Design a protein with these regions (language model features):
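Membrane-embedded alpha-helical segments of integral membrane proteins
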Residues: 1-29
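Hydrophobic alpha-helical segments of integral membrane proteins
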Residues: 3-8, 56, 60-64, 254-261
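Extended, histidine- and acidic-residue-enriched regions that form the cofactor-binding/catalytic faces
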Residues: 15-17, 54, 267
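Structural signal for membrane-spanning alpha-helices in multi-pass inner-membrane proteins
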Residues: 26-29, 48, 52, 263
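Membrane-interface helix-boundary motifs at transmembrane edges
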Residues: 29-37
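Internal/C-terminal transmembrane anchor helices
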Residues: 38-54
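A structural signal for short, hydrophobic/glycine-enriched beta-strand patches
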Residues: 49-239, 243-246
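Structured C-terminal subdomain patch of bacterial secreted/periplasmic proteins
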Residues: 241-267
């Protein structure tokens, strides 16, 4: 299923489709179909322009983020752990510090929740050999003994499964000084997890946790909002002008839709 999602995602990627339109136009030019070639190239320009507009991103991100309003860390409920979805922090074994990328707000928000006393441990998922997430978390004041590594997951489905295994597979969450549980594997309540990820990724992440880790009560703690800054901003011409950064973000939103509906409809 993961390979199918990746294949479909590659085919439906706006960059791939745009290059396909250009390739068709080149074939038509070789075949001396001048009028068709012009129409094809105009379509390619319009296609890339649309997917490069910042305002397109707000249209795409809004449906993904609308169910997860902003919540202050201080107002979040207490839980047994903070599940931190990876992808926002990079690193290198040749460099001693974490390198921040788009989505680094995730690690910041996880540390913010921990410092607010909302859970005793943070479980970063998809941690690479360079352990960049740990480097950033410790820089933000989280001690190493409050970080429980999950290093095997390669996608969001495995994130959910392996976080579940960490919480339930070694005696229950009581060993983590759980603030919400009194008994190991309590039959009347579930371990609680604050799920931290980008707001546009939350819909898919929450679906995966509820499907593949039903033993866990998952509470969304979204951050890194993309549509929110547009909510009250007046129209500006730059919103409809091409921007390479907007093109990359819009590609990632399409990836979220494919990932979510691919699992929901075909798994």
């Amino acid at each position: 299923m993961n390979m199918l999602n990746k294949t479909v995602g590659f085919i439906l990627n706006p960059l791939f489709l745009g290059m396909s339109i250009i390739a068709i136009g080149m074939v038509l030019a070789i075949c001396r179909r001048r009028k068709m070639t012009i129409w094809c190239m105009m379509a390619a320009v319009a296609w890339f322009w649309f997917w490069s507009m910042p305002i397109t991103g707000s249209w795409l991100a809004m449906p993904l983020e609308k169910d997860f309003p902003v919540q202050l860390a201080e107002d979040m409920p207490t839980a047994d752990a903070i599940a931190l979805m990876g992808g926002g922090v990079g690193g290198s074994t040749n460099y001693p510090y974490a390198m921040l990328r788009d989505g680094a707000d995730r690690a910041w928000h996880a540390a913010r929740l921990w410092r607010a006393g909302k859970a005793p441990i943070i479980i970063p998922s998809n941690v690479g050999a360079e352990l960049a997430d740990i480097r950033l978390l410790t820089d933000l004041g989280v001690p190493k003994d409050a970080v429980v590594l999950e290093t095997k997951a390669e996608n969001t489905e495995e994130n959910a499964k392996f976080v579940r295994d960490i919480l339930l597979g070694s005696g229950g969450v009581v060993e983590f000084n759980s603030p919400t549980h009194l008994f190991i594997h309590s039959p009347t309540s579930k371990p609680k997890v604050l799920l931290v990820t980008s707001a546009c990724h939350m819909k898919r992440s929450l679906y995966m946790f509820r499907k593949y880790a039903p033993e866990i009560e998952c509470i969304p703690a979204a951050t890194d909002y993309q549509a929110l800054p547009w909510k009250d901003e007046p129209f500006k011409w730059r919103h409809i002008l091409p921007d390479i950064g907007a093109f990359a973000h819009n590609n990632s939103f399409i990836h979220e839709y494919i990932g979510y509906y691919g699992y929901k409809w075909f798994r």
